[in-house]
A protein has these predicted regions:
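Structural core segment of the AMP-binding/adenylate-forming
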Residues: 1-34, 104-105, 128, 132-201, ...
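Conserved AMP-binding/adenylate-forming core of the ANL superfamily
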Residues: 58-59, 75-120, 124-128, 145-150
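Conserved AMP-binding A3 loop
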Residues: 87-89, 215-239
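Conserved structural elements of the adenylate-forming
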Residues: 92-97, 230-251, 312
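AMP-binding/adenylate-forming catalytic core of the ANL superfamily
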Residues: 144, 161-163, 294-296, 304, ...
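Conserved AMP-binding/adenylation subdomain of ANL enzymes
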Residues: 238-255, 263-303, 317
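Gly/Ser/Thr-rich phosphate-binding loop
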Residues: 276, 302-305, 319-379, 391, ...
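Conserved ATP/PPi-binding loop(s) of AMP-dependent carboxylate-activating enzymes
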Residues: 385-389, 398-431, 463-465
Length: 575
C-alpha cells in the first residue's frame, strides 16, 4: 500500500498556485492548438455527450479513438490500402469482432501478443482489437532474422503471434506453444486461423473496457546487437499530441500516407497522432519511390510520413519520373528515424517545396526536437528545437552541463519517455532526463545539431572525430550517392577513419579524389585513410546504416566515449 503521507504530499504539491496556473495555461494552449487543427467539427450535442463518455471509458487508446470516430465520423475513410478502403464504422465493427474472437481464444488483459506485419489494414485492426482487450502489443521488425524473432518472442513471453504469411519461415521457431494467426495472406493456403476469418465470424457487439489499458512495446533497431523491448504506457492526456502539433502543422480529418514502417517508433507515433486527429491512413505494404509518388497523385494525401532513406530513393529517381506525378496535395512531409543529411533536405525542398519537417528522437525518448522548413533552410542538417513542454540539455561524461556551443551527450525530458526495457534496465538518466545515446551541440539560435552516436566517436591520434560530420560532407559530393564512416584499429594512431561510399550512377570517382575533397573542407585528422566503394550500404528496415556489418570481424566496436567536457550550463527549454 502506498504511503498515505506521500499521497498527502503529492496532493498538496498539486494545489500549489504555480502548479495550478501552469496546468490552466497548458489546458488553454491545448484547446488553442486543437482548434487550430480544425479538430472541433460540428457534431450533434447527443454525439458529443456520448463521445465524452467513450473517452472517459476508454481513455487515450486506439480502442477509444476508433470507438469515438465510429460515432462522430462513421462514413469517413479510416484506412486505404491495397484491398480498398474501410470507414471508421466498418473498422470499429471489424475490430469488435476480432477482439471477441481473440478473447474466446484466451487472449486477454495484460497478455503479450507479438505482431509482425507490414503497413496494411490488418496491422491497424490487430492493434485496435488488442487495445480493446487490454493486451500488451509487441511489434516485431519485419527485417529481423528467424533467431532474433524467436529470442524476442521468448524473452517477452508472448502468448500469441500475429504475422503476415510471407514471414511464415521466419517465425517458425517462435510459434511453438503459442496461438498463431495469419494477418495479410500472400496466398490462400494458411493452415491456421486468419484475421479475415475471425473478423467475418466474430460478434460485432461493443466490448467493455479492460480494467487498465495495455502497453505498447516497440523494439530498438538492433543495429548493435539483439533488439531490446522499449515499453511505453498509453498517454494520459493530449499533451504529447499537442507537443508535436506545436511544431508540425497537421490538421484534423486529413489523409496521411504513412510510408514509414508502422512497427517502428516513428511510424507508430504518426499512427498515434492520427488517432487524435481522425486521420485517414493511406498504407502500402512495400515502399517503392515511384509507386509512392503515384499514390500521392491517386489518393491526394496532404501529409506523408517517411524515413530519410525513402526521401533519398525518391530523389534518386530520374527528374522526368519525379515530375511525372502531381504531388501538389502534400503540405507536410514529416521525416524521422535516422539522420537527415542537410544536402538531402535542401534538394528535396527545392524539388517539392518547403514542406519538410524533421523530427529527432529515439525509441526510448520518443522525441527531442523538430526542425521546420525554415530551420532546415537556415541551417541544413539541424535537428531543430524542442517542441512545447520538452527539455533538451547537453552533459559531459562527468554529468555536468557543457558550456554554450560545446558538444555533449544529448538528454531529453518530455511527456512520453519510455517505461524502461522489458528485459530490465534503462537508458542513462540525469535529473529525470533520458539519454538519446547521441552527442551534439546547440547553436546560438537554440537549434540542436546531432553529431553522431555517443559510442561512435573515433579517437585518431588523440583527436576526437564524429563520423556524421565526415559522412555529411561526403554526401554533398556530386559523385556520391551515400556514405558511411567508421573507425578501424591502427597501430600508430589507435584508430583510423575508413569511408564506405556508394557512387552515383555514372560516377568514376576515385578514393584519392575523395580524400582531397575532404582535406580541402575539414581538418587533416578527419580525412579517411581508406575508402571502399560499395554497391549499397547495409541498412535496417528503417533506413539506418548497420555499421557493425562494415567493421572488420575483430573490431565490432568503433569508438571510445567522449572525453570530459566543461561543466558550464548550456540548456534549452521551450514552453
Amino acid at each position: 500500500m502506498e504511503d498515505p503521507f506521500e499521497l498527502v504530499r503529492r496532493a498538496a504539491d498539486a494545489l500549489r498556485p504555480d502548479k495550478i496556473a501552469a496546468a490552466v495555461e497548458q489546458q488553454i494552449y491545448t484547446v488553442r492548438v486543437l482548434l487550430g487543427t480544425g479538430f472541433a467539427a460540428p457534431v450533434r450535442p447527443d454525439k458529443i455527450a456520448r463521445a465524452v463518455w467513450l473517452l472517459q471509458r476508454w481513455s487515450n487508446t486506439p480502442a477509444g479513438a476508433y470507438s469515438i470516430n465510429a460515432l462522430t465520423n462513421p462514413e469517413r475513410d479510416a484506412v486505404i490500402d491495397e484491398l480498398g478502403s474501410l470507414t471508421f464504422r466498418e473498422l470499429h465493427l471489424r475490430t469488435n469482432a476480432l477482439a471477441h474472437e481473440l478473447s474466446n481464444a484466451g487472449i486477454g488483459p495484460d497478455q503479450n501478443v507479438a505482431v509482425m506485419c507490414r503497413n496494411h489494414r490488418y496491422f491497424v485492426e490487430a492493434t485496435v482489437a488488442l487495445s480493446k482487450l487490454g493486451a500488451n502489443t509487441l511489434y516485431l521488425n519485419t527485417a529481423f532474422a528467424g533467431p532474433q524473432i524467436a529470442e524476442v518472442v521468448k524473452r517477452e513471453a508472448a502468448s500469441a503471434v500475429i504475422y503476415d504469411s510471407e514471414f511464415e519461415g521466419l517465425v517458425a521457431a517462435a510459434k511453438a506453444g503459442r496461438a498463431c494467426y495469419t494477418a495479410w495472406e500472400s496466398d490462400s493456403t494458411s493452415a491456421q486461423p486468419t484475421l479475415k476469418q475471425l473478423i467475418e465470424t466474430g460478434d460485432r457487439g461493443d466490448l467493455d473496457p479492460p480494467l487498465a489499458p495495455g502497453r505498447v512495446v516497440i523494439l530498438t533497431s538492433g543495429t548493435t546487437g539483439t533488439p531490446k523491448g522499449a515499453a511505453r504506457s498509453q498517454p494520459k492526456n493530449l499533451d504529447p499530441a499537442v507537443a508535436l502539433l506545436s511544431r508540425i502543422p497537421l490538421k484534423a480529418r486529413e489523409r496521411a500516407l504513412i510510408a514509414a514502417p508502422l512497427f517502428h517508433s516513428w511510424g507508430f507515433a504518426h499512427f498515434s497522432l492520427g488517432l487524435v486527429l481522425s486521420s485517414t491512413y493511406v498504407l502500402q505494404r512495400h515502399f517503392d519511390p515511384e509507386a509512392t509518388l503515384a499514390a500521392v497523385e491517386r489518393y491526394r494525401p496532404t501529409v506523408m510520413a517517411v524515413v530519410p532513406v525513402m526521401l533519398q530513393r525518391i530523389m534518386q529517381l530520374p527528374e522526368k519520373v519525379r515530375r511525372k506525378y502531381d504531388t501538389s496535395s502534400l503540405r507536410v512531409v514529416a521525416v524521422s528515424g535516422s539522420a537527415l543529411p542537410g544536402e538531402l533536405a535542401t534538394s528535396f525542398m527545392d524539388e517539392f517545396g518547403d514542406i519538410l519537417y524533421n523530427l529527432y528522437g529515439s525509441t526510448e525518448a520518443a522525441w527531442a526536437s523538430i526542425a521546420t522548413p525554415q530551420d532546415l533552410r537556415a541551417a541544413p542538417g539541424t535537428a531543430g528545437v524542442p517542441p512545447r513542454g520538452t527539455v533538451v540539455r547537453l552533459f559531459d561524461d562527468q554529468n555536468q552541463e557543457v558550456q554554450p556551443g560545446g558538444t555533449g551527450r544529448i538528454f531529453v525530458a518530455n511527456e512520453m519517455l519510455f517505461d524502461g526495457y522489458t528485459s530490465g534496465g534503462n537508458k542513462a538518466n540525469i535529473e529525470g532526463m533520458l539519454s538519446t545515446g547521441d552527442v551534439g551541440h546547440i547553436d546560438a539560435n537554440g537549434r540542436l545539431f546531432v553529431e553522431g552516436r555517443d559510442d561512435e566517436m573515433i579517437v585518431s591520434g588523440g583527436e576526437n572525430v564524429f563520423p556524421a560530420e565526415v559522412e555529411d560532407l561526403l554526401a554533398r559530393h556530386a559523385g556520391v550517392a551515400e556514405a558511411a564512416v567508421i573507425g578501424i584499429p591502427d597501430k600508430e594512431f589507435g584508430q583510423r577513419l575508413k569511408a564506405f561510399v556508394v557512387r552515383r550512377p555514372g560516377s568514376k570517382l576515385t578514393d584519392e579524389q575523395l580524400k582531397t575533397y575532404v582535406k580541402s573542407n575539414l581538418a587533416r585528422y578527419k580525412v579517411p585513410r581508406e575508402v571502399e566503394f560499395m554497391d549499397e550500404l547495409p541498412r535496417n528496415s528503417t533506413g539506418k546504416v548497420v555499421k557493425r556489418k562494415l567493421a572488420p570481424p575483430a573490431h565490432k566496436g568503433n569508438g571510445a566515449k567522449p572525453a570530459a567536457r566543461s561543466s558550464k550550463r548550456a540548456s534549452q527549454k521551450t514552453r
